Regions:
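Conserved aromatic-histidine-acidic binding/catalytic patches
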Residues: 8, 34, 76, 97, ...
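Alpha-helix C-capping/helix-to-loop hinge sites
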Residues: 23-31, 91-99
């Protein structure tokens, strides 16, 4: 990834983290526009959610992120493009001003990922397969298209 980046700390609950990874891998084979890296997939997920606008995001009715038990989640720092981070921050403001939705950055990304996971599951036509271990650095893609 080129250009300026800003480290962005996000809280992940283990279930959402695993589903995000599974959606990324499924999208590699079933979405011709899927980027070939998880970080780029996360960028696209955020940018698509921004593009829905505050009303579109509110209409989705995604259940808020819940902490199921203390100590289960974890923080990760993701190097986001400055433009993506700025768009995310503006979306947070728009959601609060236009719809009274007060979300943390992590909760907002959780919402974006939840929608991306559902779309990936729809493309696949079944539940997503969880990915054990580390994601591949340079994944082989199927002939999507």
């Amino acid at each position: 990834m080129s250009g300026e980046q800003v480290a962005t700390g996000l809280y992940w609950d283990p279930d959402t983290w695993q589903l995000a990874r599974a959606a990324y891998v499924a999208d590699l084979d079933h979405d011709p526009d899927c980027p070939t890296g998880f970080l780029w997939w996360l960028h696209r997920t955020i940018e698509l959610h921004v593009a829905r606008g505050a009303s579109g995001r509110a209409a989705l009715g995604v259940a808020p992120q819940t902490v199921r038990s203390v100590g289960r989640g974890f923080n990760r720092h993701h190097p986001l493009k400055v433009s993506t981070r700025a768009a995310l921050e503006q979306a947070l403001l728009d959601d609060r001003v236009e719809h009274g939705r007060v979300l943390s950055r992590s909760a907002w990304v959780h919402e974006a990922v939840t929608v991306a996971v559902a779309r990936s599951r729809d493309r696949l036509g079944r539940d997503l397969d969880l990915v054990p271990g580390r994601l591949p650095n340079r994944p082989v893609r199927s002939g999507v298209g």
